[in-house]
Swiss-Prot record:
It comes from the Bacteria. This is 3-deoxy-D-manno-octulosonate 8-phosphate phosphatase KdsC. It is an enzyme of class 3 (hydrolase). It catalyses: 3-deoxy-alpha-D-manno-2-octulosonate-8-phosphate + H2O = 3-deoxy-alpha-D-manno-oct-2-ulosonate + phosphate. The lineage of its organism: Bacteria, Pseudomonadati, Pseudomonadota, Gammaproteobacteria, Pasteurellales. CDD domains: HAD_KDO-like (cd01630). Homotetramer.
């Protein structure tokens, strides 16, 4: 696993069940409300500060998700896309990386083709067993509770870039221009 982590230059993440806890709440106008964990936002920003590109690939599209993507400065994304294998290959092409340089993090059946398309795969702790059986690494953190951050720390540690998250200077650099 260490060798795989050292080679990662691109991370593709699912949203519902990974960056959120997977629950959908609706306001009085019928608009979906989601919550995102601040640690995951920091993990995304830290990867980008360490020259590791991050993309979002979601089966859903919503104004709140587009806002989160914009807030984090993510440039590559596909929203409302359930066929994730082709989407992963398209994102890799846009990022200029190979499958071996790409990691994917997901939580459910819809992510199985993406796991197969990418060189390294992660599942959140609360993913179903058949999803856990399909990935390279099962995280100890649940989706929406900092699972992305757990993965990003692993990648940065493996690449000798842990100063991005384990020093005050690295942390301050990452949050300087971000609303988390």
């Amino acid at each position: 696993m260490q060798q795989k982590l050292e080679n990662i230059k691109f991370v593709i993440t699912d949203v519902d069940g990974v960056l959120t806890d997977g629950q959908l709440h609706y306001d009085a106008n019928g608009e979906a409300i989601k919550s995102f964990h601040v640690r995951d936002g920091l993990g995304i920003k830290m990867l980008m500060d360490a020259d590791i590109q991050v993309a979002v690939l979601s089966g859903r599209d919503s104004p709140i998700l587009r806002r989160r993507i914009a807030d984090l400065g993510i440039k590559l994304f596909f929203l409302g896309k359930l066929e994730k294998e082709t989407a992963c290959f398209d994102l890799m092409k846009q990022a200029g990386v190979t499958a071996e340089q790409t990691a994917y993090i997901g939580d459910d059946s819809v992510d199985l083709p993406a796991f197969a398309a990418c060189g390294t795969s992660f599942a959140v702790a609360d993913a179903p067993i058949y999803v856990k059986n399909a990935v390279d690494h099962v995280l100890s953190t649940h989706g929406g509770k900092g699972a992305f951050r757990e993965m990003s720390d692993m990648i940065l540690q493996a690449q000798g870039k842990s100063s991005v998250f384990d020093t005050a200077q690295g942390f301050l650099k990452s949050v300087k221009s971000m609303g988390q």
